Regions:
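Short, surface-exposed terminal/edge motifs of secreted or surface/virion proteins that either
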Residues: 22-40
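Acidic glycine-/aspartate-rich tracts in secreted/extracellular proteins
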Residues: 24-28, 52, 121-123, 160-162, ...
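GGW-centered surface loops in extracellular recognition modules
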Residues: 40-117, 124-125
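Short aromatic-cysteine micro-motif
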Residues: 108-112, 138-322
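Short hydrophobic/aromatic-rich beta-strand motifs
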Residues: 17-24, 318-320
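Short, intrinsically disordered N-terminal pre-domain segments
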Residues: 1-17, 26, 470-472
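C-terminal, surface-exposed recognition/capping segments
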Residues: 251-285, 306, 326-334, 361-472
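Extracytoplasmic, non-cytosolic globular domains
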Residues: 310-337, 349
Length: 472
């Protein structure tokens, strides 16, 4: 290597990838320090959407270097996570392997097969006269903004979880034994085309799912709302698109950023209703060998005696099949039906492992009131309330499956009573499904063949109340 004089060095544009060499006198170690930690200028990146513009596509803002590498810096991808929240990264190219080498045990013996991030970060949502913004910052909160703290966390990497029928635990595993039989645990189907071995567990009420999730220990959840909110927000920020069902585009834009979405969602079998009785039809092992892949997957199933290719399975850095397959009723969202045939969303701000009361809105935080309905059906709002890490459509209609947020909200047009919030959409939901799809028609005690659960966990308890960061 040739010697270079200091005065001959070119200047650098400081960004998320700029580091200094530092020495820790106490530890006796030399390492890299992000310039932002020294300068106080935290890297942040996000997207903005023009008010009044119906396009779901946003514009990038902030540090483009961070935008190009956000998934890598957050550590998005597959992990093995123990009940004690110790996580081991899986190989980015094949989840059958550990990142460090060697085979990965996804059957439950070494932990849960999860997807998530391995560093905490901060999320900001705000607006000015012209734009609505969603941004994330690394290393600390953004000064001059309300900040939401997001701890290290994860969810079922296969999209949904299985039930350990022996121990009544909700687990993220890929296991074909009877102990983890999916669906409603119907043993009579074993060996048939519609066997539920290695399938997601379904047809359980959310109260049963969340109780089974907590059998893993503290800070384990089922269909926890913040996990879905942040997954959706990261997709919007990384893709720059509110329509996650947009066609996948492997080509980066002129700024080196992702664009498009991960497609409409999974295909259906020939007779999901008559032959499958609406139970799961794609195994939990789909896409494992693709690692932290982003794009579209496919698999082949025995469709009542015929080999059928099931395509359009979405994958987001290894998170598979997380919308338009099985509904997932949230364990900590509650809808109050109003006299004018609208609904109001309530949540709990404490993500500490306690179980939110699903029989009363007393003591809960009101998020917002949705649109009025003349009759039960799907509605599309122009704007969404994004508050306390919860989402809900605002009152003004005028959106569609290709404009604004693009996802549907099913309003039962009921005038009283409480309802649960069923998220993600089902395989029959078509273009109404997606990251902020919400069906508000079912009682919280409801359970059907096409309702499942994604297992969630966080490394620490936190609140969904934002904190203001004072400017220097």
């Amino acid at each position: 290597m040739e010697k270079t004089l200091m005065r001959e060095l070119e200047g650098l544009n400081v960004g998320a990838n700029t580091y200094l060499l530092g020495y820790d006198t106490k530890a006796g170690k030399t390492g890299l320090i992000a310039v932002s930690q020294v300068s106080g200028s935290l890297p942040w990146f996000g997207r903005k959407w023009a008010k009044g513009n119906s396009s779901p596509v946003g514009s990038p803002v902030g540090d483009f270097d961070l935008g190009q590498t956000l998934a890598k810096q957050l550590g998005l991808g597959g992990y093995l996570v123990t009940d004690a929240h110790v996580r081991t990264k899986l190989s980015a190219s094949n989840h059958n392997l550990l990142e460090s080498g060697g085979a990965a045990d996804l059957t439950g013996g070494a932990g849960h097969y999860q997807w998530g991030w391995n560093v905490p970060f901060y999320y900001q949502v705000y607006e000015d006269d012209n734009y609505l913004y969603e941004t994330v910052s690394l290393g600390g909160p953004r000064p001059g903004f309300w900040n939401y703290y997001i701890p290290v966390g994860s969810r079922s990497c296969a999209g949904y979880a299985a039930m350990d029928r022996t121990n009544s635990k909700l687990m993220s595993v890929v296991n074909s034994t009877a102990q983890f039989r999916g669906g409603n645990n119907d043993a009579s189907l074993d060996g048939l085309f519609n066997s539920q071995l290695c399938m997601p567990a379904t047809n359980m009420a959310i109260s049963a799912f969340r109780t089974a999730a907590r059998k893993n220990g503290t800070l384990w959840f089922a269909n926890e709302r913040v996990m879905q909110y942040i997954t959706a927000a990261l997709k919007r920020i990384i893709f720059g698109n509110r329509n996650i069902q947009a066609t996948f585009n492997a080509t980066l834009d002129t700024n080196g950023l992702r664009q498009g979405g991960t497609g409409v969602g999974i295909d259906q079998p020939t007779a999901w209703a008559d032959a499958w009785k609406y139970y799961p039809y794609v195994k939990l092992n789909v896409g494992i060998d693709q690692g932290d892949f982003t794009g579209i997957l496919n698999t082949t199933i025995n469709d009542n005696g015929t080999q059928k290719t099931i395509g359009n399975i979405p994958s987001f850095y290894g998170l598979k099949n997380d919308y338009k397959y099985l509904y997932a009723m949230s364990e900590n969202m509650l809808l109050q039906c109003n006299a004018d045939k609208s609904q109001t969303l309530y949540v709990s701000d404490n993500i500490d492992g306690s179980q939110m009361n699903l029989s009363s809105v007393a003591g809960l935080t009101q998020i917002g009131k949705g649109p009025v309905a003349s009759a039960a059906g799907w509605q599309y709002a122009k704007e969404y309330t994004l508050k306390n890490l919860a989402f809900f459509p605002k009152e003004e209609l005028g959106g569609s499956t290709s404009t604004y947020f693009c996802d549907g909200y099913y309003n039962p047009a009921a005038t009283s009573g409480l309802r649960g919030a069923a998220l993600l959409g089902g395989a029959l939901s078509g273009v109404a499904a997606g990251s902020v799809c919400l069906d508000g028609s079912a009682a919280v005690s409801g359970a059907t063949a096409y309702w499942g659960a994604f297992l969630c966990e966080y490394a620490e308890a936190f609140t969904t109340q934002p904190v203001w960061c004072v400017e220097d």
